[in-house]
Amino acid sequence: MTKADAFVRAWKLAQKGDFSFFDEIVHTDYESENQGVSINKELSKGVISGNGNLITIGPHRTIYEDNSFLCFVRYAKVREDALFCELISAVHYKDGKIIKNETIREEIASDPSEGEDWNWEDYE
């Protein structure tokens, strides 16, 4: 499993309230910075699980990965609205676990699944 695969799996499980894999791969001193706002591991859990019924995370693609760093991009959809965005994350590792995650989000005008070989239902 790639680092990006593990990240996405942990976050998807956390969206459903299952933090076992999240706790396994995320460092106790974890910090997340999203759109310029920093939060710790416990607050991140609340944010992720609170968004679980609202957001579908689509496919992802790794831009760069080594032992201490991951940069990857993924699509997201707000389930009740026709809002789509692209998320780019810079993920730092310490002792083999995620220590810092910096994510920026950019709204995109059209559904990224249109004309592609995937659909949102595959990721719900």
Where are these regions (language model features)?
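C-terminal and inter-domain tail/linker signature
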Residues: M1-E124
